[in-house]
Amino acid sequence: MARDYDHLFKLLIIGDSGVGKSSLLLRFADNTFSGSYITTIGVDFKIRTVEINGEKVKLQIWDTAGQERFRTITSTYYRGTHGVIVVYDVTSAESFVNVKRWLHEINQNCDDVCRILVGNKNDDPERKVVETEDAYKFAGQMGIQLFETSAKENVNVEEMFNCITELVLRAKKDNLAKQQQQQQNDVVKLTKNSKRKKRCC
């Protein structure tokens, strides 16, 4: 049976508890939003296929629990991850401060993974405490892209997921190109070595 996609990528959504990770996932995967807050126990995931530059990309998006007591569960889910979405709540300064810790955790668990920073709940200017300028400055220092989103109002959610997918797709193609180049170099070396051996005879 033929596959209905060209690429399969695993994405992970991490961040403090209550920042809206599940809401972002539900908005992107099912285009739904629920105002009631339920803590995710352990890990939940959704699947959605998107098209990027004419290629079908199947996304397996894992929503992890942000609470400290679930940290051990979370660490096992980094395996095989291609992209990580780090979420903070623009109405919670603490969740923004904790982004550094989450980025450190990514570095501890993943060798080479694409990352983006997401400031969620960006739909009530009066409650916003993490300034856009500060967030952009921090993202620049970390070398990652920033998106301010609202799962509630459906603002920038699609764009954010498309961005991380494009980053992962580009990284995959770059890695393939490097591998092919390395193989060509190895073939050239082998050919040169065999010619040298013939001359020695």
UniProtKB/Swiss-Prot annotation:
Root EC class: hydrolase
Entry binding sites for GTP: 18-23, 34-35, 37, 39-40, 66, 120-121, 123, 151-152
Membrane topology: Lipid-anchor
Stated consequence of mutating R79W: Decreased interaction with ACAP2 and RUSC2
Activity control mechanisms: Regulated by guanine nucleotide exchange factors (GEFs) including DENND1A, DENND1B and DENND1C which promote the exchange of bound GDP for free GTP. Regulated by GTPase activating proteins (GAPs) including TBC1D10 and TBC1D13 which increase GTP hydrolysis activity. Inhibited by GDP dissociation inhibitors (GDIs) which prevent Rab-GDP dissociation.
Effect after changing Q67L: Loss of GTPase activity. Increased fast recycling
Matches recorded under CDD domains: Rab35
Modified residues (Phosphothreonine): T72
Effect annotated for changing D4A: Decreased interaction with RUSC2. No change in interaction with ACAP2, OCRL and MICAL1
Binding residues annotated for Mg(2+), in chain numbering: S22, T40, D63
Cofactor: Mg(2+)
Modified residues (O-AMP-tyrosine): Y77
Keywords tagged on the record: Cell membrane, Coated pit, Cytoplasmic vesicle, Endosome, GTP-binding, Hydrolase, Lipoprotein, Magnesium, Membrane, Metal-binding, Nucleotide-binding, Phosphoprotein, Prenylation, Protein transport, Transport
Consequence the record notes for mutating T72A: Loss of phosphorylation. No effect on binding to GDI1 and GDI2. Loss of interaction with ACAP2. No change in interaction with RUSC2, OCRL and MICAL1
Keyword Phosphoprotein carried by entry: yes
Effect recorded for T72E: Phosphomimetic mutant. Loss of binding to GDI1, GDI2, CHM and CHML. Loss of interaction with ACAP2. No change in the interaction with RUSC2, OCRL and MICAL1
GO cellular component: cell projection membrane; clathrin-coated endocytic vesicle; clathrin-coated endocytic vesicle membrane; clathrin-coated pit; cytosol; endosome membrane; extracellular exosome; intercellular bridge
Entry's free-text remark on domains: Switch 1, switch 2 and the interswitch regions are characteristic of Rab GTPases and mediate the interactions with Rab downstream effectors. The switch regions undergo conformational changes upon nucleotide binding which drives interaction with specific sets of effector proteins, with most effectors only binding to GTP-bound Rab.
Function recorded in the entry: The small GTPases Rab are key regulators of intracellular membrane trafficking, from the formation of transport vesicles to their fusion with membranes. Rabs cycle between an inactive GDP-bound form and an active GTP-bound form that is able to recruit to membranes different sets of downstream effectors directly responsible for vesicle formation, movement, tethering and fusion. RAB35 is involved in the process of endocytosis and is an essential rate-limiting regulator of the fast recycling pathway back to the plasma membrane.
Subunit: Interacts with DENND1A and DENND1B; in a nucleotide-dependent manner. Interacts with DENND1C; weak interaction which is nucleotide-independent. Interacts (GTP-bound form) with ACAP2, RUSC2, OCRL MICAL1 and MICALL1; the interaction is direct and probably recruits these effectors to membranes. Interacts with EHD1; the interaction is indirect through MICALL1 and probably recruits EHD1 to membranes. Interacts with GDI1, GDI2, CHM and CHML; phosphorylation at Thr-72 by LRRK2 disrupts these interactions.
Family: Belongs to the small GTPase superfamily. Rab family.
Protein name listed in UniProt: Ras-related protein Rab-35
Species of provenance: Homo sapiens
